[in-house]
Regions:
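Cleavable N-terminal signal peptides
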Residues: 1-2, 12
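Generic detector of short alpha-helix boundary/capping microenvironments
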Residues: 2-3, 177
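N-terminal signal peptide c-region/cleavage motif recognized by signal peptidases
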Residues: 7-9
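Long, compositionally biased, intrinsically disordered segments
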Residues: 12-299
Length: 299
């Protein structure tokens, strides 16, 4: 079999950041100036190519940071993906706390090339939120994607963005935690299963789905912008797919993709060698059936 690498690149120079996800952890209440606030840890995980085909090649380590995410107030209770533009209420700096060189699981049925040097970097920051009954969005973006991506129309000029929805603070929700490494290597002509396993610390019901990856508002002229201010334009722009590709058919009509909505188990088949973008979203429902969180990962 030939070799297929499923990747996403968001480095300012392109070609070295190949994936990631954005989440959060509820810490508890704190008193600030006599007012009760709700404290959260914001967690950004990135996966960086440190091989010879990266830019820069043979990267020593991912950037130190801080990276900056925006905190925006949601405007419609019960509709976390609806509403109008979201007002910026704060910016949080995310500092790198851990870097690990990882070895992703590689398929045994095809030859793997040079793209097996990968750094996992974890960035964290803390934010105190006011009580509201609509929730908040955490937003982070970067440009540009790898120009070799097959299933996007103009990948080299499109950015990548993450948006995580935090339910109303009284819920005290933490986002699901992915337990696998989202760097899937596939063999052309061979169907491969990827777990996308996540554990929810609150015991919420998780529903998995394929979605359009976010492109955001960054671009080649502004590859690492500060969070949009004064508002986050809503909805966040998605990528522009190439002809014949979409969220449900990321490998085209001749390919195959499947996701189990209850478990996150995915299966992929591609008839062609190339770099492809896939996004998986997790929606959290509490025991009352209310949406309390939305997160996603880009592969």
């Amino acid at each position: 079999f030939a070799f297929l690498l499923l990747v996403l690149c968001i480095n300012a120079q392109a070609t070295h950041l190949i994936g990631g996800n954005l989440g959060y952890e509820y810490i508890g209440t704190v008193i600030v100036g006599g007012v009760t606030k709700y404290r959260y840890k914001i967690i950004l995980t990135t996966y960086t190519n440190c091989g010879p085909d990266a830019n820069p090649a043979f990267q020593i380590e991912p950037e130190q940071g801080p990276l900056f995410a925006g905190i925006y107030e949601h405007d419609i209770a019960g509709l976390p993906l609806g509403g109008a533009d979201k007002p910026l209420i704060d910016t949080v700096g995310l500092n790198r706390i851990d870097t690990t060189k990882i070895t992703p699981e590689l398929p045994s049925s095809c030859t793997v090339g040079a793209r097996t040097c990968i750094f996992e970097a974890v960035y964290v920051g803390f934010i105190n939120l006011d009580l509201n009954f609509t929730g908040y969005h955490v937003f982070y973006e970067r440009c540009c994607r790898n120009g070799s991506i097959e299933n996007l129309l103009t990948p080299g000029s499109e950015g990548l963005a993450f948006d995580a929805y935090i339910g109303p603070p009284l819920v005290g929700n933490s986002s699901p935690v992915f337990t696998d490494v989202p760097i899937p290597f596939l063999c052309v002509g061979d169907t491969t299963s990827i777990l996308n396993t996540a554990v929810d610390p609150d015991g919420d019901n998780l529903v998995y789905s394929f979605v359009d990856p976010y492109a955001g508002y960054s671009g080649p002229g502004a590859p690492a912008p500060l969070p949009p201010d004064p508002t986050l334009g809503w909805p966040v722009p998605s990528v522009t797919w190439g002809g014949g590709y979409n969220a449900l058919q990321p490998f085209g009509a001749a390919g195959y993709s499947f996701i189990n909505g209850a478990t996150g188990l995915t299966a992929y088949y591609s008839p062609l060698v190339g770099d492809y973008v896939v996004a998986v979203e997790i929606t959290e429902y509490n025991a009352s059936g209310n949406i309390v969180g939305i997160t996603r990962r880009d592969l």
